[in-house]
Amino acid sequence: MARVTIEDCLKEVDSRFTLVHLAVRRVLQLRGGAPPLTEVRNKEVVLALREIAAGKVTVDNIRRLEEAKALPEPVAVTQKEDVARLELKEIMDEATLYDASMEFDEAQQVVEPDAEPSEEG
């Protein structure tokens, strides 16, 4: 189905009122992690309407769909998080290897705002 229309959805439900309630409920399910019943290429609202137009979401099965288990996190998100964790670990490892005592003497030479700068160089 290239384009979903209200007319397509109304072939599957008895009224616009029912369609709105069914679509809202399905969108909330999708946002809560419910598995999609059709190809995922659109936002939740369009996806819900596509599912209704395809006859996969009905007044009779909407409650059963709420009980379906949520999908695991999308692989792309999980991979990005793994890369971020790895980068953070590398940064932390490098930070713990860094010899902070090398610059300790320089850190002690903090110039107080009220004090005059020394003539040492």
Curated annotation (Swiss-Prot):
Transmembrane segments: none annotated. It is an enzyme of class 2 (transferase). Keywords: DNA-directed RNA polymerase, Nucleotidyltransferase, Transcription, Transferase. One of its GO terms (biological process) is DNA-templated transcription. Pfam families: RNA_pol_Rpb6. Its EC number is 2.7.7.6. InterPro entries: DNA-dir_RNA_pol_omega, Pol_omega/Rpo6/RPB6, RPB6/omega-like_sf. One of its GO terms (cellular component) is DNA-directed RNA polymerase complex. The keyword Ligase does not apply. SMART domains: RNA_pol_Rpb6. SUPFAM superfamilies: RPB6/omega subunit-like. It catalyses: RNA(n) + a ribonucleoside 5'-triphosphate = RNA(n+1) + diphosphate. Promotes RNA polymerase assembly. Latches the N- and C-terminal regions of the beta' subunit thereby facilitating its interaction with the beta and alpha subunits. Belongs to the RNA polymerase subunit omega family. The RNAP catalytic core consists of 2 alpha, 1 beta, 1 beta' and 1 omega subunit. When a sigma factor is associated with the core the holoenzyme is formed, which can initiate transcription. This is DNA-directed RNA polymerase subunit omega. The gene is rpoZ.
